[in-house]
Amino acid sequence: MTDTASRQAPLHAPNDALTDVAGLRVGHARLSGPGALSGTTVVLAPEGGAIAAVDVRGGGPGTRETDALDPRNLVQRIEAVVLTGGSAYGLESASGVMAWLEEQGRGVPVGREPGQVVPVVPAACVFDLGRGGDWRARPDASTGRAAVEAAARTEPGAPVEEGNVGAGTGAVVGPLKGGVGTASTVLPGGATVAALVVANAVGSAVDPDTGALYGQYFTGERPALPSPEVHTAALRRLAETYDKYGASPLNTTLAVVATDAELTRAQAQKLAGTAHDGIARAVRPVHLLNDGDTVFALATGARPLDPHPLALNAVLAAGADVVTRAIVRAVLAARTVTGPGGDFLSYQELYGTLAD
């Protein structure tokens, strides 16, 4: 494999979603009831698990079991990753996923009898406390169980719901409503690389000079720019909302980037790190002290990686690209939410058909 080959144009996979990596499933659950605007998303690996890694670059992360993914440590494969709202309180949702996996006998074998396992369930949270009006409405173990059960019910390769779902239910990006987004690509060599994000950032996804989404400049297609009149009206409405409610002090963008290529744990660690470039292209600024930006990497190992020393480059580049596209899709899929916790306007509402 040459460096030129690594730069050949990739193709979008069938669903343009994380589930295009064979064996991965995604499930969402959200809180119900008045004042609730939060939820949990679970990425379920194939039975037997996937090689996993993590890279945390935000200054205010909320995570669980990320140390287990260090390549120097014992755990080789994990069965699920949890992305959740509720800030650090919401990490309790991973307990529900852990209990479900134990019932399936899935986890690290630690006992003499079959089924005596400890499921390692890495998790990360976004800040969305109070956005529905009820500060105490946050995901718990039952929310996590509902999300993993939803993932297990899906068919292989099923489309992934985007927008105001799961951990993206109460997400915001700068002044705009955020949410869940996903994207995938097939490399010239045949490997699939995909991402799922929860876009919930302190920084903005919108170029203030044009109204285009920053990430659209990196998708290979020329952004459709709004008219100056539409953009001016959008800025005015956002300013009015800011004056009324202020800005959220804490946020986080989360991502799971995955591939069917056979990666070592060290290679997966590199993939998690370079995938952060995709966040930086789509959101400005990123990785601040009040962000908890975290990227997980999963490798199912179904497809051997070319042994050439630079073969990983194509996977690394694609990982950043699909994270950028997933953030764009999250913002475009989000819908306006109004309620006692605030008014969170969507890009779709502000810019209309331009967002289609």
Regions found by a protein language model. Give the residues of each.
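A structural signal for small-residue-enriched, beta-sheet-centric alpha/beta enzyme cores
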Residues: 2-95, 99-356
